């Protein structure tokens, strides 16, 4: 998994790319949590994510809960079909704010 962050106006976009599985969740978690400290509006772009397992989904849930605690806006942006199917299967498509 690769990632990069980009500041666009008042929001930070975290771009995740590749596979988010148990071996790669630490990097995903760190990049998202760092962004929560720096901005009130965070978008996690999942357009280029080809695979996500339960540990990757857990990172997203933890980030959403942390954003709620910090009263910050947290969005999943343009989730790939692979990500969206996992979110729907777990009924998490209604838990997250999803932006296309």
Predicted feature descriptions by range:
Residues 4-29:
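STAS-typified acidic loop motif
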Residues 22-95:
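Amphipathic alpha-helical interaction surfaces in cytosolic regulatory modules
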Residues 97-100:
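Short acidic-hydrophobic, aromatic-tinged amphipathic segments that line or gate anion-handling sites
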């Amino acid at each position: 998994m690769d990632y990069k962050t980009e500041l666009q106006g008042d929001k930070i976009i975290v771009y995740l790319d590749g596979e988010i599985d148990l071996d790669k969740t630490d990097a995903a978690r760190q990049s998202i949590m760092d962004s929560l400290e720096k901005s009130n509006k965070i978008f996690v772009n999942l357009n280029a994510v080809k695979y996500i397992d339960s540990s990757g989904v857990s990172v997203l849930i933890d980030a959403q809960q942390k954003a709620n605690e910090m009263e910050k806006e947290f969005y999943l942006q343009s989730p790939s079909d692979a990500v969206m199917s996992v979110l729907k299967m777990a009924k998490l498509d209604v838990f997250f704010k999803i932006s296309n």
